Amino acid sequence: MTMMITTGNSFEGKVIKQYLGIVRGIVVRSPTISQGLMGGLKSIVGGKIGAYSQMCEHAREEAFQLMIEHAQALNANGIIAMRYDTGEIGQAGTEVLCYGTAVII
């Protein structure tokens, strides 16, 4: 079954038959020692911190997939109002949350 996902509050041309509630995927990541060292050096001289960008992208993708799995467990075929949120966990960890409302279309 294909999961339709939107950041909007509806799917154009579709009728939402049932709202199933909030679904989410949460991932907490911290950089490896080498990523931390490279990030520290980059922060001194400036520039893009590629290792951190890659870590964040992987965390977002994993959180997104976990949200989809949560929706599938509810037999949803759509997710509306999908959002990402991030926060720091301690000094070295970053939390990525992906959430939305599971629906049946």
Curated annotation (Swiss-Prot):
Annotated source species: Legionella pneumophila (strain Corby)
Source taxonomy: Bacteria, Pseudomonadati, Pseudomonadota, Gammaproteobacteria, Legionellales
Intrachain S-S bonds: none
Protein name, as recorded: UPF0145 protein LPC_0273
Pfam (any one): YbjQ_1
Similarity-based family: Belongs to the UPF0145 family.
